[in-house]
A protein has these predicted regions:
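Secondary-structure end/capping motifs
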Residues: 228-311
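Ligand-binding clefts/hinges and TM-proximal coupling segments of bilobed small-molecule sensing domains
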Residues: 24, 61, 142-165, 239-274, ...
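Short, low-complexity disordered leader/linker segments with a strong preference
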Residues: 1-33, 331-334
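Short, glycine-/small- and polar/acidic-enriched structural segments
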Residues: 29-169, 174-179, 183-190, 205-207, ...
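Periplasmic-binding protein-like
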Residues: 110-120, 197-229, 233, 237, ...
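Phosphate/pyrophosphate-binding betaalpha-module
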Residues: 194
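Conserved C-terminal helix/tail region of periplasmic/extracytoplasmic solute-binding proteins
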Residues: 301-334
Length: 334
């Protein structure tokens, strides 16, 4: 398979590394180079991983991490075939991949709350899901996490989809709302509503997670790595969890660290304000109760799979316990 990913070396300076205990003449053992496919462009929303690199958490696990950015459409196929070992992906992608016999495994939960939401302007009078009846709702696409979140929401509240005019608007939610093309739009909570609020535009937001908290982004690997490279998987999960824990406790410092990887996030005062607000909103969706950081819940997976089955995206009900594992999730200190 011919791939030209945009690879950016994430580890700027690896510390001395792991030393072999070979008497007085110990030699440095090279860290293992590992690629993490991000599925998106560089962004402050990846702060936990930037922190884990900068703080040396991956280095302490003997890992030299490389970020592979981009919009790879067959990312989970590459992980399933072991061409890539690790990726950031959402639960719906994992469910779809497993239905296609791709042996991918979700090994660390990142987003505790599903971040898809419905945004409207106050004059639309949309305060709760049932208020969407008779309205025009813009969607980026009729597939993917945004659309699955929408379907889960209308199913959860008993809203008949035929009562809503669903319009494909691409990723133009802000303009579509501001120009009155739609009454509401399906968005990501840390993106469009944040931009609009900082621009002085009041918005009303309905969070899908308040009605159907599906599985969102996490760390993905494959069955072969789980079975044959358990120590590597454990190291990846532990380092990522430490980065996440640090970011939750120190969001301002995490933002400053992120600028070493995404300098354009502070290219001017306005851009920096938006970037800081995006990270602050993201933290709200990553926060977990004590002992829950990184853990997956079977009920969320079952709910997501059922929505996808009703949509016709998957035909059979699979064992959700094969889709994820909590065996590598440990309590960490940042």
């Amino acid at each position: 398979m011919h791939r030209k990913p945009k690879r950016i070396l994430a580890l700027l300076a690896l510390m001395a590394g792991v030393l072999a205990a070979c008497g007085g003449g110990g030699q440095a053992v090279p860290a293992e180079k590992v690629t993490l496919a991000m599925g998106f462009i560089p962004n402050v929303q990846f702060a936990p991983f930037y922190v884990a690199v900068e703080k040396g958490y991956f280095a302490e696990e003997g890992i030299e991490l490389e970020f592979d950015y981009g919009w790879e459409t067959d990312l989970l196929k590459l992980v399933g075939s072991d061409e890539l070992q690790f990726a950031i992906a959402s639960g719906d992608q994992v469910i779809l991949a497993r239905s296609q016999d791709l042996p991918v495994v979700y090994v660390m939960n990142w987003y505790r709350r599903f971040p898809v939401c419905i945004v409207s302007l106050p004059e639309a009078g949309i305060q709760e899901p049932l208020d969407l009846a008779g309205k025009r709702v813009g969607t980026p696409a009729t597939y993917g996490a945004s659309y699955i979140g929408w379907r889960a929401l209308v199913d959860a509240v008993g809203l008949d989809e035929t009562d809503v005019e669903l319009i494909s608007i691409g990723y133009t939610q802000v303009a579509a709302l501001s120009e009155g093309q739609v009454d509401a739009a399906i968005c990501y909570a840390m993106n469009e509503p944040v931009q609009m609020e900082l621009a002085g535009q009041a918005v009303d937001t309905i969070y899908v997670a308040d009605y159907a908290n599906l599985v969102s982004n996490g760390l993905i690997t494959n069955e072969r790595s789980v079975q044959e490279r358990a120590e590597l998987v454990q190291g990846m999960v532990r380092a990522a969890l430490r980065g996440l824990a640090f970011t939750l406790e120190n969001p301002d410092e995490a933002f400053d660290i992120s600028l070493k990887f995404v300098s354009e996030a502070a290219s001017d005062a306005q851009t920096e304000a938006v970037s800081r607000a995006i990270l602050a909103r993201s933290v709200e969706f990553w926060s977990a109760e004590p002992g829950e950081l990184g853990r997956s819940e079977p009920a969320q997976w079952a709910a997501a799979q059922e929505v996808m089955r009703q949509m016709g995206l998957v035909q059979n009900v699979e064992d959700v316990n094969a889709m994820f594992t909590n065996q590598f999730v440990v309590e960490v200190e940042p």
